């Protein structure tokens, strides 16, 4: 009898993607994050769906509807804690996934990489509109500050900001449309993730050495299904520890107060996963300049394939590039810390230096290191 998974029109697609897929035999745990991100997305969609059944997107009742979910709905507190901390896990996996791509030169699969950057931007947009929904102080002021950045665009800025708000300030219309965006975007993310996977399977996975792995491939199942299962176990463990023992550790205390347009919080700051970009935005004392730097901090990922000068794909055998990569990692952690600090010295100057270093590393130092390593690896006889 012919195997059904190889002939059935639907099962055939699943088979080619997750069962009989030829996979390099040497991919490390750094290749687990794709499946972890898929699982994060599923958790977020499921918990979000059940939360949406009880949430009301109206300025008068949004805050109390979230309180009602936590107090009166069966396991509502758990759903909310899993959803809020699930977002943090999602971004943790995203950053590690992107970092892996930079370290091992995965960005040379241009289509896969570009779709990945679009995915990153879409997830960031989803998280931003989602953070506004509980209608706490930080939700309201975060929405006000970030949407206000649109007004920095020359000529059409003010009109654009008011169009997004649906009025002259962040209000009921804004909350309603943000809820609509937050509901639809995860399904767009799912579709994009499928396209991401489609492009990846056109070329096959990269591997730590960066050389062509065709000579030594193994089937995805059972080898990598079991490996992914182990990764998922760790993900669930960390998520449950967060959600059950310290659910508010990564949140902002200001968000326990209902939104009040007449009272500005002393320090307006977004969730931890946006702090690096927020620090870059704040480090430029000009509004439009800050917005452009904010965009550049993410969009710079799109030009990484053009900045690749090394003869080798991976950084595995390139110690100078490795050193610069880890300096970049430390720099991003520094920016994340600065983004959460008040706008005063010495934080201002540290933020400006870290922002400069971020752009300098990616645009100048890493391409130069690639050229230097090419020269050093040339035979000298």
Curated annotation (Swiss-Prot):
Residues reported in the UniProt entry to bind a ubiquinone: 201
Cofactor note as given: Binds 2 heme b groups non-covalently.
Keyword Oxidoreductase tagged: no
Residues reported to bind heme b b566: 97, 196
GO cellular component, one term: mitochondrial inner membrane
Subunit structure: The cytochrome bc1 complex contains 11 subunits: 3 respiratory subunits (MT-CYB, CYC1 and UQCRFS1), 2 core proteins (UQCRC1 and UQCRC2) and 6 low-molecular weight proteins (UQCRH/QCR6, UQCRB/QCR7, UQCRQ/QCR8, UQCR10/QCR9, UQCR11/QCR10 and a cleavage product of UQCRFS1). This cytochrome bc1 complex then forms a dimer.
Protein name: Cytochrome b
Organism whose genome encodes this protein: Myoictis melas
Organism ancestry: Eukaryota, Metazoa, Chordata, Craniata, Vertebrata
GN (gene name): MT-CYB
């Amino acid at each position: 009898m012919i195997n059904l998974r190889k002939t059935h029109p639907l099962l055939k697609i699943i088979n080619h993607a997750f069962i009989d897929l030829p996979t390099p035999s040497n991919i490390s745990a750094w290749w687990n994050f794709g499946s972890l991100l898929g699982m994060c997305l599923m958790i977020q969609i499921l918990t979000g769906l059940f939360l949406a059944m009880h949430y009301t997107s109206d300025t008068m009742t949004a805050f109390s509807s979230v309180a009602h979910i936590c107090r009166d709905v069966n396991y509502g507190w758990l759903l909310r804690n899993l959803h809020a901390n699930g977002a943090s896990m999602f971004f943790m996996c995203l950053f590690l996934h992107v970092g892996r791509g930079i370290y091992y030169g995965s960005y040379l699969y241009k289509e896969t990489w570009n779709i990945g950057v679009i995915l990153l931007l879409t997830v960031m947009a989803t998280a931003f509109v989602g953070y506004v929904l509980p209608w706490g102080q930080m939700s309201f002021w975060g929405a006000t500050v970030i949407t206000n950045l649109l007004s920095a665009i020359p000529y059409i800025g003010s009109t654009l900001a008011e169009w997004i708000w649906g009025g002259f300030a962040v209000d009921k219309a804004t909350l309603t449309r943000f809820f609509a965006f937050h509901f639809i975007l995860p399904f767009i993310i799912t579709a994009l993730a499928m396209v991401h996977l489609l492009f990846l399977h056109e070329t096959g996975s990269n591997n730590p050495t960066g050389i062509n792995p065709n000579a030594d491939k193994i089937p995805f199942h059972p080898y990598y299904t079991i490996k992914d299962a182990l990764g998922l176990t760790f993900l669930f463990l960390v998520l449950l520890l967060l959600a059950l023992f310290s659910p508010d550790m990564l949140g902002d205390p200001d968000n326990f107060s209902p939104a009040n347009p007449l009272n500005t919080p002393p320090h307006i700051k977004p969730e931890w996963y946006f702090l690096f970009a927020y620090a870059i935005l704040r480090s430029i004392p000009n509004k439009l300049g800050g917005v452009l730097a904010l965009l550049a901090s993410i969009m710079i990922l799109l030009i990484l394939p053009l900045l690749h000068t090394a003869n080798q794909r991976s950084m595995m055998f390139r110690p100078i590039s490795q050193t610069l990569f880890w300096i970049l990692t430390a720099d991003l952690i520094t920016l994340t810390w600065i983004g959460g600090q008040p706008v005063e010295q010495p934080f201002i100057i540290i933020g400006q230096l870290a922002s400069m270093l971020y752009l300098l590393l990616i645009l100048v130092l890493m391409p130069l290191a690639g050229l230097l390593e090419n020269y050093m690896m040339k035979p000298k006889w």
